[in-house]
C-alpha cells in the first residue's frame, strides 16, 4: 500500500477481502520453483496473502513490507514486518521471491522500478506482480471527470497518464532480465447490495477514491461521493436485489531472473 497523507483504513479495505485475494492466488499459482532465500510480500497491506504465501513457501522466512502503519499493525502471519516506502525499499539479503499484489500501481516509473526490484533478487529468483488496470473503466474515469469538473482548482488531468502501462509495454522492460510471463484477466465481480451507497462506490472508496477524498473537505467529499454514486447508477445498473456486477481488469507479470 502507498503511504499517503491519510493512512489506509484496514476495516474498509477488508470488506472485499475475497475479491482482492483471488487475483493474488492466481498470480501465486504461476510462481515457479524458487532458489534459496526469503519471500517478500511487497506492499503486504493487511496481510491477506500471508497464509497463501506461507503454504506455498513453508520452509522460508516470510517478510511483509508496507508503507502504511495501520495496515502493518493488523497484518499477521509474517516472520518480520517492515515499514518502508516500497519504491526505495532494500532487502537485508537477496530474496528468492518478491511478491507484489495490487501495490505497484500506486507508483510510477515502472520502466525503472521493475528492473530495480529484479536486481534485488537472488540468482534465479522471481518477481511476481499483479496490478489493477482499470483506469479506462467507468468506475475510475468517472472519478477523474467529476473531480476535474467539481474541483478544477485541485484536479487537472489534461496531462495525466496512468501508472500501469498496457501489457505489451512491459515486455521490453522485463524480457532482457530473464524469463517473462505476462497476461491480463478480467474478473466479473458480483458486489452485494450496500446500504446508502452504490456497490461499486463501496468497493472503490477504500482504494481508487482515496487520492480524491484526501484532498477534499468533509462537505466537499460528501458532494463528490453523491455525484459519484449517481454516475455509477448509469454505468453499473443494479440487479433486482440491489447488487451490481463490476468487470475488473488486472495485469499479471512473472519474471524469473537469469541465475
Range-by-range predicted roles:
Residues 107-108, 121-123:
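Helix-to-beta-strand junctions that scaffold the AdoMet/dcAdoMet cofactor pocket
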Residues 107-116:
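A short, conserved alpha-helix within the catalytic core of class I
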Residues 38-91, 112:
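Class I SAM-dependent methyltransferase SAM/SAH-binding core
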Residues 99:
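A conserved beta-strand element that flanks and buttresses the S-adenosyl-L-methionine
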Residues 8, 181-240:
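C-terminal helical/coil "lid" or tail adjacent to the Rossmann-like core of SAM-dependent
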Residues 111, 126-194:
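Conserved catalytic/acceptor-binding region of the Class I
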Residues 102-103:
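Short catalytic micro-motifs in class I SAM-dependent methyltransferases
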Residues 1-34, 48-52, 71, 208:
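Conserved class I S-adenosyl-L-methionine
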Amino acid at each position: 500500500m502507498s503511504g499517503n497523507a491519510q493512512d489506509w483504513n484496514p476495516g474498509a479495505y477488508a470488506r472485499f477481502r475475497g475479491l482482492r485475494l483471488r487475483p493474488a492466488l492466481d498470480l501465486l499459482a504461476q510462481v515457479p520453483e524458487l532458489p534459496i532465500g526469503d519471500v517478500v510480500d511487497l506492499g503486504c497491506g493487511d496481510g491477506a496473502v500471508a497464509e497463501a504465501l506461507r503454504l506455498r513457501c513453508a520452509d522460508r522466512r516470510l517478510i511483509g513490507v508496507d508503507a502504511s502503519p495501520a495496515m502493518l499493525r493488523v497484518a499477521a502471519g509474517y516472520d518480520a514486518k517492515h515499514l518502508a516506502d516500497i519504491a526505495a525499499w532494500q532487502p537485508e539479503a537477496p530474496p528468492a521471491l518478491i511478491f507484489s499484489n495490487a501495490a505497484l500501481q500506486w507508483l510510477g516509473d515502472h520502466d525503472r522500478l521493475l528492473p530495480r526490484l529484479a536486481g534485488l533478487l537472488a540468482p534465479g529468483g522471481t518477481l511476481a506482480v499483479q496490478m489493477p488496470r482499470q483506469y479506462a473503466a467507468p468506475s475510475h474515469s468517472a472519478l477523474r471527470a467529476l473531480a476535474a469538473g467539481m474541483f478544477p482548482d485541485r484536479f487537472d488531468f489534461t496531462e495525466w497518464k496512468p501508472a500501469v502501462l498496457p501489457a505489451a509495454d512491459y515486455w521490453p522492460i522485463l524480457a532482457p532480465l530473464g524469463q517473462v510471463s505476462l497476461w491480463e484477466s478480467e474478473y466479473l465481480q458480483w458486489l452485494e447490495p450496500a446500504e446508502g451507497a452504490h456497490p461499486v462506490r463501496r468497493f472503490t472508496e477504500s482504494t481508487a477514491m482515496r487520492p480524491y477524498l484526501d484532498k477534499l473537505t468533509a462537505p466537499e467529499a460528501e458532494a463528490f461521493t453523491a455525484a459519484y454514486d449517481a454516475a455509477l447508477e448509469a454505468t453499473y445498473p443494479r440487479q433486482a436485489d440491489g447488487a451490481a456486477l463490476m468487470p475488473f481488469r488486472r495485469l499479471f507479470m512473472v519474471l524469473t531472473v537469469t541465475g
